[in-house]
From Swiss-Prot:
It comes from Nicotiana tomentosiformis. SUPFAM superfamilies: Cytochrome f subunit of the cytochrome b6f complex, transmembrane anchor, Cytochrome f, large domain, Rudiment single hybrid motif. It is found in: Plastid, Chloroplast thylakoid membrane. It is a single-pass membrane protein. GO terms for cellular component: chloroplast thylakoid membrane. Heme binds at Y36, C56, C59, H60. Pfam families: Apocytochr_F_C (PF01333), Apocytochr_F_N (PF16639). Binds 1 heme group covalently. The 4 large subunits of the cytochrome b6-f complex are cytochrome b6, subunit IV (17 kDa polypeptide, petD), cytochrome f and the Rieske protein, while the 4 small subunits are PetG, PetL, PetM and PetN. The complex functions as a dimer. This is Cytochrome f. GO terms for biological process: photosynthesis. Residues 1-35 form the signal peptide. GO terms for molecular function: electron transfer activity; heme binding; iron ion binding.
Length: 320
């Protein structure tokens, strides 16, 4: 009987442990999957709006630079590098979700011409693999292989991101044309200020939702504040909730206006976008150009030789 009770107790403990582990996994998975650039993938069919604006700017409000470097021209069915640089001061620390300070993450979206896509691993050279590191790229949508996203990844290590790109093969993709194409890029460093549902993160400034007197400020146990604003005209009280992270700028008894900043703006990151051009080169045209240049060089050589021969003849006639 005692053995049976012990077995029953052990069974309950194992079941409880599995349940707790499963719950932690689900919560963790949800937290990770909610990270950028997943937000854009979930909310927008195309990351680039008709105006040319990349949708990441809807959540990352500060404007920061981004750079892209691609070859001037590429041949069909070749692998090349698209290097995206997201510069920022490595000494900066951002406000994390728990209100503490930590390093900045970076992310990027690369919008390639139709037909261009992520190079398969067996086509990537060892030198390029070394530049890529442990990065894992993914398509924006299964049917949009020309749009690639990456992030969030540690900015200290990956402020320069190398995308391995495979150019299309006209032999298998008949709709591809040999033209000059634009490439668009967006890159962010740090967390956003707005979530896709419109709510604020703790990485932005918080403003007063009413005018009046700050009658009470309660500091929460886990960080953040509850600020009670009393409207002197009708006695109505409004409570503004400040999450952990931003620094408080007001004090009790202070008179404030509507939309006045209650906190500092802790954001040190931002988003930027840029573009570049690449020529999808026809091999036959390239060969023709080389042949033309070679013929011009040979013609120049023959002209020089002919001129020297003529000069020798003239010199011989003069001596005669």
């Amino acid at each position: 009987m005692q053995t049976r009770n012990a077995f029953s107790w052990l069974k309950k403990q194992i079941t409880r442990s599995i349940s707790v582990s499963l719950m932690i996994y689900i919560l963790t998975r949800t937290s990770i999957s909610s990270a950028y650039p997943i937000f854009a993938q979930q909310g927008y069919e195309n990351p680039r709006e008709a105006t040319g604006r990349i949708v990441c700017a809807n959540c990352h409000l500060a404007n920061k630079p981004v750079e892209i470097e691609v070859p001037q021209a590429v041949l069909p069915d070749t692998v090349f590098e698209a290097v995206v640089r997201i510069p920022y001061d490595m000494q900066l620390k951002q406000v994390l979700a728990n209100g503490k300070r930590g390093g900045l993450n970076v992310g990027a979206v690369l919008i390639l011409p139709e037909g261009f896509e992520l190079a398969p691993p067996d086509r990537i050279s060892p030198e390029m693999k070394e530049k890529i590191g442990n990065l894992s790229f993914q398509s924006y949508r299964p049917n949009k292989k020309n749009i690639l996203v990456i992030g969030p990844v540690p900015g200290q290590k990956y402020s320069e991101i190398t995308f391995p790109i495979l150019s299309p093969d006209p032999a298998t993709k008949k709709d591809v044309r040999f033209l000059k194409y634009p490439i668009y890029v967006g890159g962010n460093r740090g967390r956003g200020q707005i979530y896709p549902d419109g709510s604020k993160s703790n990485n932005t400034v918080y403003n007063a939702t009413a005018a009046g007197i700050v009658s009470k400020i309660i500091r929460k146990e886990k960080g953040g504040y509850e600020i009670t604003i009393a409207d002197a005209s009708d006695g109505r009280q409004v409570v503004d909730i400040i999450p952990p992270g931003p620094e408080l700028l007001v004090s009790e008894g202070e008179s404030i206006k509507f939309d006045q900043p209650l906190t500092s703006n802790p954001n040190v990151g931002g988003f930027g976008q840029g573009d570049a051009e690449i020529v999808f080169q026809d091999p036959l045209r390239a060969q023709g150009l080389l042949f033309f240049l070679a013929s011009v060089i040979l013609a120049q050589i023959f002209l020089v030789l002919k001129k020297k021969q003529f000069e020798k003849v003239q010199l011989a006639e003069m001596n005669f």
